[in-house]
């Protein structure tokens, strides 16, 4: 079963003239586990290895290189690019976010992205 906080390779479809991430890349599952178990879709946040780029954005969360993550380099979660995909877009499981504080930061970044904090609206 797909679980929140697990990192998979995901196929993000290319969109011409877009700034969105595309191709096969790592992503963190952020949808809740009840939906993950029952729905045909899953919500993910793509990762980028360009950790120096726009670190100041409140929707960017640094993912440090830690044992168990399966990542080969530190990464940046791009919460502004959250996307719901068919589960068939999931590739191989890479690992998981092993630091609970990182998942807490990612949850806040997602709340900022959807406008849940008035200070960002």
Give the predicted meaning of each segment.
Residues 17-24, 29-65:
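Compact nucleic-acid interaction/catalytic patches
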Residues 66-121:
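C-terminal terminal-subdomain/extension
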